[in-house]
């Protein structure tokens, strides 16, 4: 296969991965964890996946500790945990 063909295949696989919804069975287990502010006293606006509402929601992170259900953007939360897009910017 030519290098152009490989690049096309890679582009198609990347697009497919972005557009394929994540089911609850494919979702990382940390997506089901409750948000944890951690042990530090910062006040950082972060996003977590809420499995009860199937949405990425805001919480405030202290800056250290916590768990992996902690994202800087809604986009990253959606990509990782599969919440539907709400039509708002990240």
Swiss-Prot record:
The keyword Secreted applies. Keywords: Cleavage on pair of basic residues, Disulfide bond, Protease inhibitor, Secreted, Serine protease inhibitor, Signal. The record marks 41-42 as: Reactive bond for trypsin. SUPFAM superfamilies: BPTI-like. One of its GO terms (cellular component) is extracellular region. GO terms for molecular function: serine-type endopeptidase inhibitor activity. It comes from the Eukaryota. Disulfide bonds join 31-81, 40-64, 56-77. Belongs to the venom Kunitz-type family. Serine protease inhibitor that inhibits trypsin. This is Kunitz-type serine protease inhibitor C5. It comes from Daboia siamensis (Eastern Russel's viper). The lineage of its organism: Eukaryota, Metazoa, Chordata, Craniata, Vertebrata.
């Amino acid at each position: 296969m030519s290098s152009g063909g490989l690049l096309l295949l890679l582009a198609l696989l990347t697009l497919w991965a972005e557009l394929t919804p994540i089911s609850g069975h494919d979702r990382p287990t940390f997506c089901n964890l409750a948000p944890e502010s951690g042990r530090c006293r910062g006040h950082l606006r972060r996003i977590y996946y809420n499995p009860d509402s199937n949405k990425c929601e805001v919480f405030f992170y202290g800056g250290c500790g916590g768990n992996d259900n902690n994202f800087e953007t809604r986009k990253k939360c959606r990509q990782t945990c599969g919440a539907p897009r709400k039509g708002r910017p990240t």
